[in-house]
């Protein structure tokens, strides 16, 4: 983990732990739970780890000071072309905005003018984090999202206009697992014609829920409102039937929606115009991309599953990372 206790002492991704405090954990019958018990301990205590690293003949021993492991939102940020940067966000947490600003500053120093924001597989997170991220792209007083319910009053959230990336070209990558807070950001970008959305229709999760504590210590979440994009599209997909709702992604696959753009049909009642360019976009749940990219069906073949099961792909990845590290 970046900036975690192990990284601070020099342990690298791909290193294999073979012993904890002189007790072997490799080549012996030991459950994952038992291994984790040996690795974990009070904050500030120390643990000795014996590591095997590819390309190094002798085992390496590191003394790690146990500490809180940071949970980061950014998986990657780098330049893919001389003027184009790439940032991947895996979740919207308390530090997302700070991490994004730091990555943006670093990329802009490298000459970034355009940005690809990858929200594929991002299941959402904190509303405030989504608003802060959308604020980086939108102008002052531009609506980011609003909530409204049958009895809940409309609540609106606007951009402050002080973002660090309000003019460069922007592409947002989404897929069928892009949900909630991610859809708030991508919906705002699309409705204001700030950038283009590329990929497949997002999940369609946009409910506002109020937690209610019960006397026995349990809790229920009561849905009181829904999220709407600036143009008035409801992010939440229909959930009249729990069976249909739970099988939605399977049905998308079976109907060809994940492979062919022309298999997706919307009634005229779901057509909405964007705020500036008056382009036609669609409601009905989820964010429909401007440019469709079919799903990579290679992931579902027996051949691919066999490679994954035998560890071939992870071994190749580790070898590639090591070679790149030596070259740099």
Model-predicted segments: where are they?
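Cleft-lining beta-strand/loop regions that shape enzyme active-site pockets
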Residues: 1-12, 21-24, 28-216
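Structural motif
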Residues: 14-16
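A sequence-level detector of short linear motifs
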Residues: 26, 61, 221, 236, ...
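A broadly conserved detector of short glycine/acidic/proline-rich loop/turn motifs that flank catalytic sites
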Residues: 68, 91, 176, 201, ...
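Polar, glycine-rich mid-to-C-terminal structural blocks
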Residues: 181, 193, 200, 204-272
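Conserved functional hotspot residues or short segments at active or partner-binding sites
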Residues: 234-326
């Amino acid at each position: 983990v970046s900036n975690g206790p192990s990284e601070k002492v020099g342990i690298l991704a791909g290193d294999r732990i073979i012993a904890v405090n002189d007790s072997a954990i490799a080549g012996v019958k030991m459950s994952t739970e038992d291994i984790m018990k040996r690795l974990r301990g009070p904050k500030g205590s120390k643990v000795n780890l014996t590591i095997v690293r590819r390309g190094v003949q002798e085992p390496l021993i590191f003394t790690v000071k146990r500490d809180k492991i940071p949970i980061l939102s950014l998986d990657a940020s780098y330049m893919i072309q001389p003027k184009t940067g790439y940032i991947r966000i895996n979740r919207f947490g308390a530090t997302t905005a700070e991490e994004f600003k730091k990555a943006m500053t670093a990329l802009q120093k490298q000459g970034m003018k355009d940005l690809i924001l990858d929200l594929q597989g991002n299941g959402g997170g904190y509303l405030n984090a989504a608003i802060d991220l959308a604020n980086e792209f939108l102008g002052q007083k531009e609506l980011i999202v609003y909530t409204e319910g049958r009895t809940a009053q409309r609540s609106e959230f606007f951009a402050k206009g002080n973002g660090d990336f309000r003019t460069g070209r922007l592409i947002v990558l989404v897929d069928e697992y892009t949900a909630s807070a991610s859809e708030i950001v991508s919906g705002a970008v699309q409705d204001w014609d700030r950038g283009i959305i590329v990929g497949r229709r997002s999940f369609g999760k946009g409910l506002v829920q109020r937690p209610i504590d019960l006397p026995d210590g349990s809790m229920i979440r009561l849905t009181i409102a829904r999220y709407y994009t600036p143009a008035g599209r409801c992010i939440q997909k229909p959930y009249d039937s729990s069976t249909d709702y739970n099988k939605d992604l399977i049905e998308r696959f079976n109907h060809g929606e994940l492979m062919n753009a022309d298999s997706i049909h919307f009634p005229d009642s779901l057509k909405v115009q964007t705020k500036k360019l008056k382009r036609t976009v669609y409601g009905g749940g989820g964010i429909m991309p401007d440019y469709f990219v079919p799903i990579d069906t290679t992931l579902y073949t027996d051949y691919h599953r066999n490679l994954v099961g035998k560890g071939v792909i992870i071994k190749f990845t580790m070898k590639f990372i090591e070679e790149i590290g030596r070259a740099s």
